[in-house]
Each structure stands twice: as C-alpha cells, then as structure tokens.
Amino acid sequence: MSTIKQSPYIIVGAGIHGLSTAYHLAQTLKACGKGTGKDIIVIDKSEIGSGASGIACGVIRNNYFQPAMRELMAHSVAVWETDPEAFSYHPVGYMQISCESMHEDVASIYNQQKAIDYKSTFIEGHRDCNNYMLNIFHDWQAQGITSVLHEESGGYANNKKSLQGLAAKAQIEGVRIISGVTVTGFSRDNHGTIKSVETDVGDIHCDYVVVAPGPWAKQMWDMLEMPDTISIKNPDTGIISQDIPMWVYWSLQEGTLGVDPKLQQTNDGKMPPVIHVDTDEPLYSDADGSLITDKMWGIYYKPDFNFGGIQGGAAPFIVDKKADSVAVDPYGPESPEFIVGNDFSTMWVSALAHCQKRFSGTMA
C-alpha cells in the first residue's frame, strides 16, 4: 500500500455509499471519455461493509415524504433491479401499514409515487385493509389499521453479499479497493484545496476526495476543521437558529428473531414483502400481557436467510451525549454501549405477535 502515492479520485469508506460512488463514477468517466475506474481508489480502515452497511437490515423502498428522495429512490431501485443476483437483491416489495393519524401523509406519498410512475397500490379503510392483509397472511391481526401502501418494487438486499457484488462491479471497471488503511488527516494547498489524504501508511495525492465513512463522518469533519455548530434557517418563518450542534448521534434498534425464515411465507407459499407497521393501538407483552406502550409505535421486518431468522427493527433513539463523547468504535454488535437489550427484544417480538399470530410464543 505504501507504494500508492497518487490517484485522481480517492473515496474514503467501502460501504454502500463509497462503493456505489466508485462504481457509478467509473462508468461516468468512461462514458465521457475523461478516464476510467483505474483513476479511482477506495480506502477503508477495516474492510468492505465493516460499518453500518454491513449490518443494516437492507430495506429498499420508495416510502419517503420528500419528493426529491422519492425520485432518487426510484432511480436506485431501478439500479438494484439491473442485477438482482449480483446485488443479492430480493424484489419482494414493501408495505407501509398505518393507523388513521398517518392516513393523509401516506395518501400523499401514494399520489406522488403515481406522479413519477412508481407502481404501488393504496388501500383505505379498516375493513378493506384487513381483508387485503388477510389475503397475504392468514394470521394477520393488527388492529387500528386504516391505510396500506403496497409498493410493487423494492424489497431488501442481503447486506454483506450485496456489498461484495457492488465491489466486484466496481473492480471490473478498474476501481482499486484497499482495506486496512486509516485516514489520519488531509493536506491542503495554499488556496485551501485538499491536495492529499494522509493515512497511516503514507500520504496519497489526489485531485478529488469523496468522504463516505458512514458513522465515522464526524471524525472526517473534524480532520477537515469544519465547525462544531451551524446556523439553520426555518423555511417557513425565516428565523435563523444559531449554534445548532452539527452532529447528533442516533442509535438504530435492529435485531433478528431466531426462527425459521420460512415461517413468514405468504398464503401462497412465497417470500413476503417487507412489512412496516405504524400504529397507535396499545402494545401488550406477548410474554405476560403487561402494557408496553399506549403511544404510537412502529416496527419493520422481513425474513433473512443470511442471519437465519426474521430480521427488522423499530424507531431509533437519540444518543443522549455530546457528539465528542460518543464512542463509535468498537462498532455495531461489538459495541458494549449500543447493542439492543431485553426491553427492545420484548417490545419487538410482542409487536410481531400483535401483527401476526404466528409470532406469538416465539420470545425466548
């Protein structure tokens, strides 16, 4: 690695964003006659998919409130569909199943999906929603549901396998992916432009840098000597709020229920769509019947043969610490601080049982 001293493009991070950028940049350079993938290197302090991309649930959907995000995700879904095998992509669809308080917002998403020709079906009303779900799952029993948005496209990808597939496509284009290289800083020229990336194995001179380190973005931000606080303008009132912390960490709660993934097959024996339920119905423990919450709650889930079970999660929560005090390393399941506890397990499995009877009694 110490022999690599220069590359026109350096991408920091071998997760979904870094690898996707490398792959598409290589294709674009070639198409424009401005270079090839050989002009790009991806460096990662560990290995491909060692951050969030390697452990995430891998859901691929178009269910976003922002119109720009919907158009971007429609484009992304089309890319996944180009090679499902290489990307380990399962095009099973996605379902947003909601209570009345979300009805208007979900209807808006449906209308905007129609505007960009993204195929989906929208079901309204308690009875029609219940019948629709029973046609898919004979044991469906979630209460208080008044809208179902069923996206025909989308689904999920097996995290590690999809990243390996994406990396292989980038490498076919000539991109070099180098593991075990830690960024320690950036060097600038007299105009303040980044001229090289400093690493633990030597400096690499470059023309362009793409920073895609996922949860380690703050560390890169600090190396670039960017501000700790920012000012944000309210688009409706015009009021500018000062000294807002640039970084606030959220902890995503996800896990896997250790059952046969085929337990979640549909009535016709097929693999099911990804299920996302948001409801304000009271949630009771499947273990002892005690009340877990009488406020709004939500979960998402799907079968996963990589982890061997039913994988999914619930709403993330804000990490109640200053950003400088949050220990990102060790990351993921190796972290003693950010692994889910029994409270999440009880809530999530009870929520599964609330939605489908087949999950009742599966709590260890």
Predicted regions span which residues?
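Core beta-strand elements of the Rossmann-like FAD/NAD(P) dinucleotide-binding domain
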Residues: I4-S7, E198-Y208
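N-terminal Rossmann-like FAD-binding beta1-loop-alpha1 element of flavoenzymes
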Residues: S7-I41
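Conserved Rossmann-like nucleotide-cofactor binding loop
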Residues: H17, T21, I48, W216
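Conserved FAD-binding subdomain of flavin-dependent enzymes
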Residues: H24-A31, D39, K45-S120
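Active-site lid/adjacent beta-loop-alpha segment flanking the redox-cofactor pocket in flavoenzymes
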Residues: G255-A364
